[in-house]
From Swiss-Prot:
Protein name, UniProt field: Serine hydroxymethyltransferase
Top EC class of this enzyme: transferase
InterPro entries linked: PyrdxlP-dep_Trfase, PyrdxlP-dep_Trfase_major, PyrdxlP-dep_Trfase_small, Ser_HO-MeTrfase, Ser_HO-MeTrfase-like, Ser_HO-MeTrfase_PLP_BS, SHMT-like_dom
Broad class of where this protein is predominantly found: cytoplasm
Source species of the chain: Mycolicibacterium smegmatis (strain ATCC 700084 / mc(2)155) (Mycobacterium smegmatis)
Coiled-coil features, chain-numbered ranges: none
Biological process (GO), any one: tetrahydrofolate interconversion
UniProt: (6S)-5,6,7,8-tetrahydrofolate binding residues: 179, 183-185
Reaction it catalyzes: (6R)-5,10-methylene-5,6,7,8-tetrahydrofolate + glycine + H2O = (6S)-5,6,7,8-tetrahydrofolate + L-serine
């Protein structure tokens, strides 16, 4: 058994790496020398990427800064090992060390989130969602049909019975949050594979307030009768009552699947508790391991005992060989998240988002729902006469990295959009506090107030002379006061 990090009274090493900068510097300098000897362009781009990240206000809600411990864990010979299967049941010999790191990662995930079961193999959030979808289909559709046919395995079915099962698997219903309300492509939308798996319908938000309307969700569920009710979001700036979502799912006989990819760090950090913690209420919970959780890029599935056996068959159901080096990094990141300092970090993420929202409100900038109570602020840039694409580009000119995003009933569609999504996890990892985020709001408003559309184009814009330079200089002061990976020299 791995040691319980929650008993460790020391704080988590800062994500900026200050606690072991000399060691990390030596490791990266040596690594880059090796890379440079083989392909100098990659080494140069790696150095340039660090410089770019250090010199920009990163407000993309889905990005963060992993600790050097997490980053270094990914650069090992675990990358060389195939390990298809599950712990103790691999299709390859010699996987005992992979079994160890996968076991440690799963143990940390179970303890951190209070889940009966954790599956840490998915390579990404979409892989985690696909594993969850197919586990639900296997449990709710495939298993009963096999029993009806008197078969133990799909390979035992005749061609006719197999075709019957395939048709039934492909004829199920999913109800999820609409894209313009803040949902995600992987929640059953046509351009994504999930939209080709299910008959999908969407629920939205109250058109006047922008908040979830649980009565409307319940009405949609009663009418549509989905097999799967998906809760979770990528651009909704409020908390969700998952107890209510479970009540709705139970009423219509649906499986509640929660995608907490964006806010897993706030769950791990105990900012979201009770009805706002999805894990006790969902049948299946999916997440990424980066974003607010501050780990490596990857995915994870948590499940009740009912769904665990099907989720455990993620390979070969959806996945092939797991990325063993990334599973090892997940174990390190989850160990960090179990330490007390991560709870302080998560609370600061939420506090900083509130400060950012308040900074916009007092400067008369429009916000979807009028504010936030998670880590996301969704800025309605129509209040500046701009599209999301124009705003995103103008902000980038000034060294502020954001992403355009749809807002409810968006008149500019999903490409140009009318919103800009902002998130606080990354800059919080650098040490930014509430006063810093008020200043960030001021700088963003300064850029947008000095940006004008060019003609009728939804993409072209003109930024007033001197604005980009002035804002970039001001943001550089904030960044210098809160350095990224201080002491790390390349």
């Amino acid at each position: 058994m791995a040691a319980d990090p929650s008993s460790n009274s020391s704080s988590v090493p800062a994500a900026n790496g200050a606690d072991y900068a000399d060691t990390a510097s030596a490791a990266y300098q040596a690594a880059l020398q090796v890379i440079e000897s083989v392909e100098p362009r990659v080494a140069a781009a790696t150095r340039k990427e660090l410089a770019d990240q250090r010199d920009s206000l990163k407000l993309i809600a889905s990005e963060n800064y992993a600790s050097p411990a997490v980053l270094l864990t990914m650069g090992t010979w675990f990358s060389d090992k195939y390990a298809e299967g599950t712990i103790g049941h691999r299709f390859y010999a010699g996987c005992q060390n992979v079994d160890t790191v996968e076991s440690v990662a799963a143990e940390h995930a179970r303890e951190l989130f209070g889940a009966p079961y954790a599956y840490v193999q998915p390579h990404s959030g979409i892989d985690a969602n696909l594993v969850a979808f197919w586990a639900i289909l296997a449990t709710r559709v495939e298993a009963p049909e096999l029993a009806n046919f008197g078969a133990k395995h799909i390979n035992d079915l005749s061609e006719a019975d197999w075709e019957t099962l395939r048709n039934k698997l492909g004829n199920q219903r999913l109800l999820g949050m609409s894209l313009d309300a803040g949902g995600h492509l992987t929640h059953g939308f046509r351009p994504n594979i999930s939209g080709k798996m299910f008959h999908q319908r969407s629920y939205g938000t109250n058109p006047e307030t922008g908040f979830l309307d649980y009565d409307a969700v319940a009405a949609a569920a009663r009418e549509f009768k989905p097999l799967v009710l998906v809760a979770g979001y990528s651009a909704y700036p409020r908390r969700v009552n998952f107890a209510k979502m479970r009540e709705i799912a139970d009423e219509v006989g649906a499986t509640l699947m929660v995608d907490m990819a964006h806010f897993a760090g706030l769950v791990a950090g105990k900012v979201f508790t009770g009805d706002e913690d999805p894990v006790p209420h969902a049948h299946v919970t999916t997440t990424t391991t980066h974003k607010s959780l501050r780990g490596p890029r990857g995915g994870m599935v948590l499940a009740t005992e009912e769904y665990a056996p099907a989720v455990d068959k993620g390979c070969p159901m959806v996945l092939g060989g797991p990325l063993s080096h990334v599973m090892a990094a997940k174990a390190v990141a989850l160990a960090e998240a179990r330490q007390p300092a991560f709870q302080q970090y998560a609370q600061q993420v939420a506090d900083n988002a509130q400060a950012l929202a308040d900074g916009f409100v007092k400067r008369d900038a429009g916000l979807v729902t009028g504010g936030t109570d998670n880590h996301i602020v969704l800025l309605d840039v129509t209040s500046f006469g701009l599209t999301g694409r124009q705003a995103e580009s103008a902000l980038l000119d000034a060294g502020i990295v954001t992403n355009r995003n749809s807002i409810p009933a968006d008149p500019n569609g999903a490409w140009y959009t009318s919103g800009v999504r902002l998130g606080t996890p990354a800059l919080t990892s650098r040490g930014f506090g509430a006063d810093d985020f008020d200043r960030v709001a001021e700088l963003i408003v300064e850029v947008l107030a000095n940006t004008q559309p060019e003609g009728t184009s939804k993409a072209k814009y003109k930024l007033a002379d001197g604005t980009a330079e002035r804002v970039h200089a001001a943001s550089s002061e904030l960044l210098s006061a809160n350095p990224l990976y201080p002491g790390l020299t390349l």
